[in-house]
Amino acid sequence: MKVIEVKHPLIQHKIGLMREADISTKRFREIAREVGSLLTYEATKNLELETVKIQGWNGEVEVQQIKGKKATVVPILRAGLGMMDGVLEHMPSAKISVVGIYRDEKTLEPVPYFQKLVSNIDERLAIVVDPMLATGGSMISTIDLIKKAGCTRIVVLVLVAAPEGLKALEAAHPDLEVYTASIDDHLDEQGYIVPGLGDAGDKIFGTK
């Protein structure tokens, strides 16, 4: 599995702001979108292009466009919605697939409860977004669902990742590319990332 920790100064600055204990819902939500946008830029740099002819202002001209079907964005509910618009800023025609998974607070195991994938996901690049990769359970379950639907091109965008989650994800799906702003230190006894961002879902939706 290829893991890219994006060290761009803008991303590192913004992640630092998100770690503040008293950050407002508005600010946290804004930065989650911004970092999602910046990670998308990095994660799509190797998309295949093709030459097409269009009608320009003074006649026919050859231009470069992304080849084949465009991507589908796959936010993991609910926190993944906070990064979705950042992806769509760069790929506004991308289709949206949704997967709902919550983590059982006692067992820390993922519990799927909803999925709605685009019908031709097997022809698209799936960009899976979730702010936190902690134990990796929710992400693994999501990738399982996407692959079962026939998708073979998958990249993962997370704001912060724990080493334990990355290890588990690699064991389950070694063919992935993962882009993150930070690989943090460890998980605590409750399965939260340290230093982490706190509960990203609560902070994005104002339910903290």
From Swiss-Prot:
Regulation of catalytic or functional activity: Allosterically activated by GTP.
Listed InterPro entries: PRibTrfase_dom, PRTase-like, Upp_B, UPRTase/APRTase, Ura_phspho_trans
Pfam assignment, any one: UPRTase
Pathways involved: Pyrimidine metabolism; UMP biosynthesis via salvage pathway; UMP from uracil: step 1/1
Lineage, opening ranks: Bacteria, Pseudomonadati, Pseudomonadota, Gammaproteobacteria, Alteromonadales
Domain of life: Bacteria
One GO-annotated biological process of the protein: uracil salvage
Reaction(s) the record says it catalyses: UMP + diphosphate = 5-phospho-alpha-D-ribose 1-diphosphate + uracil
Protein name: Uracil phosphoribosyltransferase
